[in-house]
Amino acid sequence: MRILQIVKTNRGATWAFNQAKWLMENNVEVVTVLPEDRGGYADKYMAAGMQVVKGDWSLPLRRPWKFFGRAKEIRRVVAEIKPNLIHLHFVTNVLMVRLALHSDKTPRLFQVPGPLHLESPFFNFGERIVATDSDHWAGACKKTCRIYEEKGIDPARVSLAYYGGPLAQQAQEPAPAGPILRPEYGIGQEEKMIAMVSYFYKPKRYIGQTRGLKGHEDFIDAMELVFKKHPQARAIIIGNAWDGAEAYEKSVIAYGKEKLGDRVIFTGYRNDVKDIYPEIDIAVHPSHSENLGGAAESLAYGVPTIATNIGGFPDIVVDGQTGLLTPVKDPEALAQRICYMLEHPDETREMTDRGQALVRQLLEIANTAGTIKGIYEKILKEG
């Protein structure tokens, strides 16, 4: 079985790499199209024995004159690789490939990493209108699958397929020698670390967004309220700007310092997040749109987790059972839930233990990638 995978970024999408690596190790040949064939994840794919093809297969909305040349290149590569199935992860790639291969009968699978584009009427309609009988969908959360079915897509062409990671291997890794952020930033042992781990995604003004997608400003507003009841808490924001959002990141830092003063710490990018998680008291995910997001990571590391009640979060953050859900864009409600966890440590620990067990089983790469392999086989068998 030969799969042609299309990934729009060479910088991230670790979930796509983990999945492809497992598939390669389990008798599925994976050829991956990336914007670059050197550096970044291209090197990781090749080190894992996978062929990488250089190509930007995104829909050139801002440079429409590039469309026909790009479509010609897509048809050339597909004719050369001769895949049994084309696997896509990003809507901009999906639109481009469907238009370029509209009459091509090669089966295509869109593994939808989140419901964000479905929340835009333009992309929601556009993505479905260019689909043909060759197209199939694998939603990476229950909400995504539900939206497609509600929009009239045949349920037989829609599957549930989470992205996963090597969680069993992670569980065997030695614990860090000791705290990292506490000594680095002079955080006392009595201070509770309430953390948000996320890149900064700038607001999309053209669709009316005034705050960033990940809800950084909501977290800051919530922590201002938390400090009134729990002055011993500290707000920690880990991450940096994503894809040209440097000006937005600076504005959030300024906003945070204005509202919280020295009680908020912005660490910037860290390559040791997995070693930092054990010292975090509560992980907060106030996203405005999301799949499973960072909640999967914080639960996997056994950190008490609060997330907004949107997207795929409820699949793993079962309110009151594995963590707490909070209304989206509601800093006051978020503050109440942070305070609840601080004031109920035993109950919080029990929820977190259940959440860790759920995530480590549900999102183990052998289970998630095994599901994708089964979907491939089903699509190809049905012809």
Regions found by a protein language model. Give the residues of each.
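Short His-centered aromatic/hydrophobic patch
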Residues: 88-94, 112
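A conserved, positively charged/aromatic
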Residues: 109-138, 151
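Acidic donor-binding loop of glycosyltransferase active sites
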Residues: 278-291, 303
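Short hydrophobic beta-strand element within catalytic cores of glycosyltransferases
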Residues: 304-307, 317
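Conserved acidic donor-binding segment of nucleotide-sugar-dependent glycosyltransferases
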Residues: 319-320, 324-331, 340-346
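A short, well-ordered alpha-helix in the C-terminal region of glycosyltransferases
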Residues: 333, 340, 347-362, 368-374
